[in-house]
């Protein structure tokens, strides 16, 4: 599919929006697993500053993944809005051209 076709095909936009939503869900799920598994690594030799540093680093990484999820969801929403807007404009153009 060419970019020009994509930008004039509301269904293709919605299909792509669903893909972005799936990617957002995958990133969210996998980052949650990663964060939770990092909380379980503390042991007898893993405490104090090392543990605090690890938890701080993992918190920052988790925050970065949340930002990625937000970006993916924003793209999803914008594609859906663009598809609706294009369909509405297309319908208005048809009415104008048909004289209704």
From Swiss-Prot:
<comment type="similarity">
    <text>Belongs to the WXG100 family.</text>
</comment>
<dbReference type="Pfam" id="PF06013">
    <property type="entry name" value="WXG100"/>
</dbReference>
<dbReference type="InterPro" id="IPR010310">
    <property type="entry name" value="T7SS_ESAT-6-like"/>
</dbReference>
<protein>
    <recommendedName>
        <fullName>Putative ESAT-6-like protein Y</fullName>
    </recommendedName>
</protein>
<dbReference type="InterPro" id="IPR036689">
    <property type="entry name" value="ESAT-6-like_sf"/>
</dbReference>
């Amino acid at each position: 599919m060419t970019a020009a076709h994509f930008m004039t095909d509301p269904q293709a936009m919605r299909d792509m929006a669903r893909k972005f939503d799936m990617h957002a869900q995958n990133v969210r799920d996998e980052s949650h697993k990663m964060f939770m598994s990092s909380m379980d690594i503390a042991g007898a030799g893993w405490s104090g500053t090392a543990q605090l540093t690890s938890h701080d680093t993992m918190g920052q990484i988790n925050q970065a993944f949340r930002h990625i999820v937000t970006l993916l969801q924003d793209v999803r929403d914008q594609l859906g809005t663009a598809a609706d807007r294009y369909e509405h404009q297309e319908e208005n153009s048809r009415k104008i051209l048909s004289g209704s």
